[in-house]
Amino acid sequence: SPPFTSDQDLYTDSR
């Protein structure tokens, strides 16, 4: 998911 959805999603996208 894009890095602007949620904090949790941010970390998932940052892997």
Curated annotation (Swiss-Prot):
Its EC number is 1.11.1.7. GO terms for molecular function: lactoperoxidase activity; metal ion binding. Its cofactor is Ca(2+); heme b. It is an enzyme of class 1 (oxidoreductase). One of its GO terms (biological process) is hydrogen peroxide catabolic process. It catalyses: 2 a phenolic donor + H2O2 = 2 a phenolic radical donor + 2 H2O. Binds 2 calcium ions per subunit. It comes from the Eukaryota. Keywords: Calcium, Heme, Hydrogen peroxide, Iron, Metal-binding, Oxidoreductase, Peroxidase. Coiled coil: none annotated. Removal of H(2)O(2), oxidation of toxic reductants, biosynthesis and degradation of lignin, suberization, auxin catabolism, response to environmental stresses such as wounding, pathogen attack and oxidative stress. These functions might be dependent on each isozyme/isoform in each plant tissue. Belongs to the peroxidase family. Classical plant (class III) peroxidase subfamily. This is Peroxidase 2. It comes from Daucus carota (Wild carrot).
